[in-house]
A protein has these predicted regions:
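Noncatalytic, beta-rich nucleic-acid-contacting surfaces in large DNA/RNA-processing enzymes
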Residues: 1-169
Length: 169
């Protein structure tokens, strides 16, 4: 998959338990963002969108437009991030050892071949990562570490070195 950017066999995430993780097909979502209700933020009324989840393998990223292209079991989806959010997940985390050598602790989550579970909503032909503080989904982006035979995912929600209480995303 890494060099060809497509699966010549069945997608790795094809047998994920979609009901357990509330994963939807991007094509089944309404192209208009579905507004559930409204809330007030800093004196302005804002729409609260219905959140969906998609999973897929990263095949490309565009640092200028802050987009990531995911290959899902159902097709290709463009995920549009906000600038700060994109930079947070795109950076490589490393530390300098006592002997002066740099050790990579964690690579970018947007490297080709990385599997992600993303929570958000559909806006036209793009998927926008989003979470609400009182939502059942506590993270907008999660790294899929492993998938077992029964479709159960092993997920990583925090970047290495990130505080659990930080609440950035």
């Amino acid at each position: 998959m890494d060099s060809l950017s497509y699966y010549y066999h069945e997608h790795e995430l094809a047998h994920v338990d979609r009901d357990r993780y509330v994963i939807e097909s991007f094509d089944n979502m309404s192209s208009d963002s579905e507004v559930v209700n409204h809330y007030f933020y800093r004196g302005q009324q804002k729409p609260r969108f219905k959140l969906y989840r998609i999973c897929g393998t990263v095949i490309d990223k565009d640092k200028n437009h802050h987009t990531v292209t995911l290959l899902t079991p159902d097709g290709v989806v463009t995920v549009k991030f906000y600038k700060g959010q994109f930079g947070f997940y795109d950076r490589q985390i490393s530390e300098v050892g006592e002997d002066g050598t740099k050790t990579v602790l964690e690579k970018s989550w947007f490297s080709r071949g990385t599997k992600l579970l993303i929570t958000g909503y559909r806006r036209d032909e793009q998927f926008i990562p989003k979470k609400y503080s009182d939502s059942i989904f506590k993270h907008s982006v999660q790294l899929i570490k492993d998938i077992d035979e029964e479709g159960i995912l092993s997920l990583q929600s925090e970047r290495i070195g990130q505080e659990k209480e930080e609440g950035m995303l």
